[in-house]
């Protein structure tokens, strides 16, 4: 098994993260394949050193909430493994999407205008769900100042018939001293209208419904809110989620139409874009193919928490 996985890794058909997941499921230690935790190979350790490094690993995880692990510690089989990208290497497209989602969540919470720049490192954990502790370098468009964000993003299993489910647990400026524990999303605190099975189409108007529930996004909205393009790229990724090369080959996306549906009946229709809970019906084109997507954004009202549930269908080739 190890030889087969090693061959798949070497030829690029298997990512480190996927291999981690397979090994965790088999109950093996990731070091059996010498998977890189840093750009340099980490030497083996004795049992006494393992015990000491396990304590150091726990200290680093506890103090940084999983964001700062130096790569020299002994990583448990199902622990948080660091990936260092350096100055010139880009992350996988999936990780970049998650980093941008964290910046978007922070901007909503703090009413800031941080711009995603790059990801110098991220840490990944399996196997119950894919959790990414992502360090993101950003630029504040208000004063052109640089900051470092820390985002905890989790891709979990489907709960409501969605193709892709992604949630944020932490979206913060990197603290100088250790902060609070991780606070998970409270599903029961989400508005009932946005819970349950994912819708496939725009809801029909009932007798008591108000047309103010719906807003068709205008071109100027897309220009002013780059996260609408992020949601559209997430929609494309949802369709190609098992083929990242296929996803990358279809970029960029061309937004055709977006309908926002929300229970918040703002008198100014454009304000629906700022609703904490909303459903986005997105039609877009990518690589001469038309797609339709339903993306549901919800929150439990706590800072740093967003849940995205996405279904996407390919309609036709143009």
Curated annotation (Swiss-Prot):
Leader peptide range in chain numbering: none
- Stored NCBIfam families: A_thl_para_3677
Q: Which organism is it from?
A: Arabidopsis thaliana
Question: Which protein are we looking at?
Answer: UPF0725 protein At3g44770
Q: List, alphabetically, the InterPro entries matched.
A: MS5 (IPR006462)
Q: What family does the entry list?
A: Belongs to the UPF0725 (EMB2204) family.
């Amino acid at each position: 098994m190890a030889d087969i996985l090693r061959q798949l890794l070497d030829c690029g058909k298997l990512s480190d993260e996927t291999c981690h997941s397979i090994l965790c499921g088999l109950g093996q230690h990731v070091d059996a394949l010498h998977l890189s935790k840093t750009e340099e190979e980490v030497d083996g350790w004795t049992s006494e050193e393992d015990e000491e490094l396990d304590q150091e690993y726990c200290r680093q995880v506890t103090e940084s909430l999983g964001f700062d692990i130096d790569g020299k510690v002994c990583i448990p089989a199902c622990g948080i493994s660091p990936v260092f990208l350096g100055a010139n290497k880009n992350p996988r497209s999936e990780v970049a999407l998650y980093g941008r989602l964290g910046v978007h969540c922070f901007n909503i919470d703090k009413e800031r205008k941080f711009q995603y720049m790059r990801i110098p490192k991220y840490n990944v954990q399996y196997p119950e769900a894919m959790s990414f502790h992502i360090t993101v370098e950003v630029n504040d468009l208000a004063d052109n100042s640089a900051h470092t964000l820390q985002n905890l993003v989790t891709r979990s299993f489907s709960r409501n018939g969605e193709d892709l489910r992604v949630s944020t647990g932490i979206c913060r400026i990197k603290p100088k001293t250790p902060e609070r524990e991780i606070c998970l999303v409270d599903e029961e605190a989400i508005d009932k209208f946005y819970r349950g099975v994912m819708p496939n189409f725009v809801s029909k108007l009932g007798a008591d419904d108000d047309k103010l529930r719906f807003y068709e996004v205008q071109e100027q909205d897309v220009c002013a809110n780059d996260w609408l393009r992020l949601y559209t790229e997430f929609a494309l990724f949802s369709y190609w989620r098992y083929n990242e090369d296929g996803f990358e080959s279809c970029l960029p996306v061309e937004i055709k139409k977006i309908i926002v549906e929300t229970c918040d009946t703002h008198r100014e229709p454009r304000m629906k874009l700022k609703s904490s809970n909303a459903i986005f019906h997105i039609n877009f084109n990518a690589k001469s193919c038309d797609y339709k997507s339903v993306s549901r954004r919800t929150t439990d009202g706590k800072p740093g928490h967003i849940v995205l549930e996405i279904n996407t269908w390919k309609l036709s080739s143009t």
